[in-house]
């Protein structure tokens, strides 16, 4: 990133701040009047011209003013912006939104997406936790009918994965209960991402090879883990908030945005990318996300956890012209609060 002088940074900050609040191109006189830049309008115009030449600002042909480019926004976010600390009143309002008792993890995550949407006035998104990132709590086998078994895989976090298994032999419920007890002892507290390998190792054990109970229990479990436990879902709340942004008033642009939200896999791919770097708030601007359908929006995201275990990611999607200094602290606080609330379900 280019080095900018203090004056250059001051002018860039003024342009970004004004553009975020108004959505309109910013002129030198506006900067001179509103932002206390103690130089003439002519000097400010020269600085803005230099910033445009360096790729930080852009001048729409219909206007004498300028707007920040993605590069300008990125420099502002990384080097200039100062967060607005949440007031205690705002923190309490967010806490209050979670105060009613929530029946399960699913409803807690859905509530989180609503809270983000409401407080940030954009789209709130929460990526459903990946089972493979959580710890094993128990497995249950339920005989539904001859040759058909329902397998319930439960994580320490309270997530439940259902799998229907068609089995060659008919197995009674009493024997299935023995399978559960054996596997619950074997796999206790193991990361679910490691269970498949542990089952394969156990299947090669000599004593297991000659024990029908152990062998059959492991084979059924192996079949469960051959399915895709990596699959994700995402809760999205407040799509219509995006349409209130003037950037999306254009019908074609609005249709592209709504189509992108309709296909959840695109949003999941965007959120999955942020899981690779699982510490703190991340911001992905426009074309940085590699998904052409989403290159007109920004994502502000933060991971959420249960204890030391990373579960997923949540955040806010909006236009490039979001009030980052206000929204980032909301996302950060809500992620911390969600992580605290997730300590409660799934305890032994």
From Swiss-Prot:
It holds the Pfam family HrcA. One of its GO terms (biological process) is negative regulation of DNA-templated transcription. Belongs to the HrcA family. Transmembrane segments: none annotated. Keywords: Repressor, Stress response, Transcription, Transcription regulation. It comes from Syntrophobacter fumaroxidans (strain DSM 10017 / MPOB). Negative regulator of class I heat shock genes (grpE-dnaK-dnaJ and groELS operons). Prevents heat-shock induction of these operons. GO terms for molecular function: DNA binding. This is Heat-inducible transcription repressor HrcA. InterPro entries: GAF-like_dom_sf, HrcA, HrcA_C, WH-like_DNA-bd_sf, WH_DNA-bd_sf, WHTH_transcript_rep_HrcA_IDD. It comes from the Bacteria.
